[in-house]
Amino acid sequence: MEEFQVYLELARSRQHDFLYPLIFREYIYALAYDHGLNSSILVENLGYDNKSSLLIVKRLITRMYQQNHLIISANDSNKKRFWGYNKNLYSQIISEGFAVSVEIPFSLQLISSLEEAKIIKSYNLRSIHSIFPFFEDKFPYLNYVSDVRIPYPIHLEILVQILRYWVKDASSFHLLRLFIYEYYNWNSLITPKKWISTFSKSNPRFFLFLYNFYVCEYESIFLFLRNKSSYLRLTSSGVFFERIYFYAKIEHLVEVFDKDFPSTLWFFKDPFIHYVRYQGKSILASKNTPFFMNKWKYYLIHLWQCNFYVWSQPGKIHINQLSEHSFYFLGYFSNVRLNPSVVRSQMLENSFIIENVMKKLDTIIPIIPLIRSLAKVKFCNGLGHPISKPVWADSSDFDIIDRFLRICRNLSHYYNGSSKKKSLYRIKYILRLSCIKTLARKHKSTVRVFLKRLGSELLEELFTEEEEILSLIFPRASSTLHRLYRGRIWYLDIFYFHQ
């Protein structure tokens, strides 16, 4: 963020607040290159080290300075369009660099809004595990939950019109429009799956920018109406500056609701509604009745249809009772479990029996999908029986053990928040035995002979539980650590979850 701010201030002083000239700056492509090496959140890395270099960028900038070269590359020997979809290296590099330049003002706006609201930066809050303590604190007191998948894609023209309110530089806006419409036909949606998949892989940063912008626009209106319209003049709604036709959109939504419901905004004022999202999936939970949740359901459908012209099937948004149904979010099945208890109270000669029900959030590891994932990458078969990993048999013993250890520790690190650790122990057992079988295969031996020769203590020490390691470091507190470790542990250093 600080690098972005320095670069943007430099460009502003020289280019009068225009973003378009930034695509002629070499450091923009350096930032895109660095992002490509370090990011693998939604899309796989495409080998940026093979596709980007300072020489290629210099050559690209020189060609962009040529007149009319940004429209059609007439000098290309293969006669391909300069912006041809996934056919030209230059178009991909420009799209990545342009995505960086467009992200800069949004990053600065976010920083300024946080400073105005006096929100302290906390890297712990960036961890996706920080969501689960929130679940533990709030969800036992709620009754209903709804799984909502944000519909995507949005029509191109709607996306362009939304972006027009934010991108004030006309040249940048026209270049952005050129990118979008050259990648897709005018009358197509952004959604044939083969197109969206190819586009997300060939231009990951540009794709993420468009998707995140759409989600941000949807959530800004959703949360604004959730907090009722009187909040518009407060500091918390600073993200709505310079919005054109925003009031008109709200009036249109109000008219839609006025036709369907007697009261328009009263159901936005419920203090017990909670909204959580990660990537394209969100959770909506409330303490109110199913009738209230059903209103929210159709409110979201109207919002998508009226404001973004995206169709969402009402039957795909399910409203379930938390005590009877589990919802899947961030790799866990979660539900609210009822723990009934009976307390006998004695007062003088009279005794009373008091029945009490405690609610507790359960987080369960999805063992069957995890075993399927392990079977897909050849750690076990479809039934969960460990098998060797032949692809790794050519590596050294140290590399083989290190790979298995990293996978085992990462899974243990992520799923230590489970209420029931039995499933986690099963996954560890599969990885441990698969490691032994891979080593035995490499040395052309059986598992029994290999362990007898090497000694089973070695792998036992390598796969030692974190609980045992802590007890060795703090022997006096071993009993306390044992009770703590058997409970749920949420780590605040996990920043993304790769599906």
Swiss-Prot record:
Encoding gene per record: matK
Pfam families associated with the record: Intron_maturas2, MatK_N
Keyword Ribonucleoprotein: no
Compartments reported by the entry: Plastid, Chloroplast
Superkingdom, taxonomy of origin: Eukaryota
Family that this chain belongs to: Belongs to the intron maturase 2 family. MatK subfamily.
Protein name: Maturase K
Keywords: Chloroplast, mRNA processing, Plastid, RNA-binding, tRNA processing
